Amino acid sequence: MKKIIALLLALVMVLGLVACGAEKPAETKAPETQAPAAQNPEVTEAPAPMDVTLKVWAPSEDQNPELGEWLITMCNQFNEMHPEWNITFEYGVCTESDAKKLVPQDMEAAADVFLYSSTNLEVLTSSNALAEFGGTYLETVQNNYPQSMVDCVIYDGGVYGVPMTTNTYFMYYDKSVFTEEDVKSLDVMLEKGKVAFPLANGFYNAAFYLANGATFFGEDGTDREAGIQLGGEKGTAVTHALIDYVANPNFIVAEPADAIAMMREGNCDAYVCGTWQAAQTQEILGENFGVAMLPCATIDGQSMQLRPFTSAKCIGVKSTTQYPEVALKLALWLGGYESQKAHYELRGYIPCELKLMSEVQDDIVCRIDAQTITEIAVPRYSFAEFSFFWTPAESMGLEIRDGVVTHENAAEKTEAFNQACNNSGI
């Protein structure tokens, strides 16, 4: 009996333990974490755009609505690209050649960004009118343009602008009047049609003197002491040739703007100009639009290749601009891929930005421009003394046109012309 009672007690104890083990354990909750207080840092508003006023000068054609308002269009795009600035542009008319005079004479009133000719670089730098490019601005110029164009904005080792386009000239002609073979000879052309040449303009009439060995500051254009040499027997021979050409009724003395008007009226079959009138000329001639390098001319009984000048049109920044960062970036924009592309499409300006140059090789104007620069053109360097040439050259051209210069006084007139080209006239 005692054994039975002991067994019953043991069984009760086991059942009690089992019952206790089956109880649901207390829930272990993750400690309640209070939601962190909302982070409310002070809201930092974007800084207000900095107000900037920039004066920008360019030729009237670049601001003409009928020609696409290149300058205004590209400046507006630049403004939109830079929300950090609120730019007010003040536009003025100034040709590339006039910049050398208008900028230095009143630096306070002058444009912050302006177009200039590389031939005037010495004048502008010697008057401290141009800002020198450095840092990333300098690298952009060095890396995105042909070296020949970079050289155009270098003076005394510094870079003073952005190349915008080449500046040379060639011949536009009507293919229904002249063949590709005809346009190699001025004499042949004059037998078949009317040819306009801007004889009263040194930029163009120098082509005849250069054809017969004239030099501007030495053979390579870098010898200041050599001066301008277009006199002597060779220079006189050119003057005689020009007298004969002017006597030909098919040789028309006319500036490009007048020549294209005459072509539109059917009174001119070929004329000399640069890229800036390509689109209008193509519109006039249609499928008969022809482009060629300058022809050969007969000088002293020999066929001589006419040789044009070449240089660059550039974009500069005033050295005293109140907003150098904005002005430098605008100059790079106006000379960069997008702006050069727009200039090419609107006005036929030949690109000199490397990437864009590779994209326009199918354009005959671009090809002839490149061929001209490579094969026959003579570089114009930036010596200030070059400026002595223009007025005497204009006068010489006018006097030949008007018959003041004759075969009888050609030698005397040519020598006087040469002396005037080497004298400031002061």
Q: What is each model feature region?
A:
Residues 46, 118-170, 181, 292-293, ...:
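Hinge/lid segment of periplasmic solute-binding proteins
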